[in-house]
Amino acid sequence: MKILYWGTPEYAVPTLLALHAAGHEIVGVVTQPDRRRGRGKQLMPSAIKVCAQSLGLAVFTPERIKTDVGCQKELADLNADVSVVVAFGQILPKSVLEQPPLGCWNGHGSLLPRWRGAGPIQWALLEGDSETGVGIMAMEEGLDTGPVLLEQRLPISLDQNSHDLGEKLSQLTATLMVEAVDLILKAGVGTEPERLERLNVRYQGQEMSYARMLKKEDFQIKWGDPALRTHRRVMGLYPSAMTGWRNKRLKVLETEPLIERLSDEISEEARALLGRWRTGEDHPGTVLGCINNVGIVVSTSGCPILIREAQLEGKGRCRAQGLVQQLAASVGDRFQSF
């Protein structure tokens, strides 16, 4: 099978490696152009570009594939049988979708039609979904609207952050895409309706939700929220949820909500703290306790929340006792909105 691969972040690397290892001919890799990143704002290649070059594959980096007619022709001349897309970062135009005879297929990190769009992993965590998964979808001009060929579900635990969940979903995408490509090859060529009928795809229902682009304010911890919502913000937007501490930014990296009904899902250290503080008596964001070797307990609009790991502006990451010592917090101190 001659495959044209489209992807950009680290999330897309396992699928490229899996397809290459399965013996398919990767005729080209399309990724986003090099971007300036980090403190030094150095021009850096995407994770997929680095991976593709290590495999000796041809790389294409259109700034905007929709209007880059020259790149579109170069890709058409590769005569790929199929296009595989995982987190590319641009919407493919109809002219590109119609190029490969076996279609364009996308590995999407949600249970479609829930969380169509660019941030399905983050939104599944932010909204407290009990499960998520991966779908292999035939691409259309609409955003993540196509019929689903394969799908696999994955439970979400309370202690998972977006990085950990993303790693699991990226590996799951790789496994599922290799299986999907074999099915697509066996189904053979024909009109799109004929191919999709032979593949017995599932058409998406109408009860959809959209994973909108995240805004700056989404990353700001709102201590007036309940503990569980604050926890979901921290874990869903890992490692970027932030608050203020003595006029410096503090990235909050790991929390546990001190909620009785979640006692089976939190750590032994957190369970030992249940019931020690009366709910809602202190101003949200107030330090209620600095627990040696555990972390810092903070008030919310409801039950308290335990901060287990954080990173103060200009400092390294600290957890448990190191966090207590670095912040030098006292009961009654307050975190600030930033």
Swiss-Prot record:
Please provide an example of a Pfam family that matches this protein in its UniProt record.
Formyl_trans_N
The enzyme's main class, written as a single word, is: transferase
Key word Transferase present: yes
For the ligand ((6S)-5,6,7,8-tetrahydrofolate), the binding residues are: S110, L111, L112, P113
Under Gene3D superfamilies, the record lists: 3.40.50.12230
Highest taxon listed in the record's lineage: Bacteria
**Gene Ontology cellular component?**
cytosol
Please list the reactions this protein catalyses.
Answer: L-methionyl-tRNA(fMet) + (6R)-10-formyltetrahydrofolate = N-formyl-L-methionyl-tRNA(fMet) + (6S)-5,6,7,8-tetrahydrofolate + H(+)
Write down the EC number.
2.1.2.9
Keyword Protein biosynthesis among record annotations: yes
Q: What does this protein do?
A: Attaches a formyl group to the free amino group of methionyl-tRNA(fMet). The formyl group appears to play a dual role in the initiator identity of N-formylmethionyl-tRNA by promoting its recognition by IF2 and preventing the misappropriation of this tRNA by the elongation apparatus.
User: Which family, according to UniProt?
Assistant: Belongs to the Fmt family.
The entry's protein name is Methionyl-tRNA formyltransferase
Q: Which organism is it from?
A: Synechococcus sp. (strain CC9902)
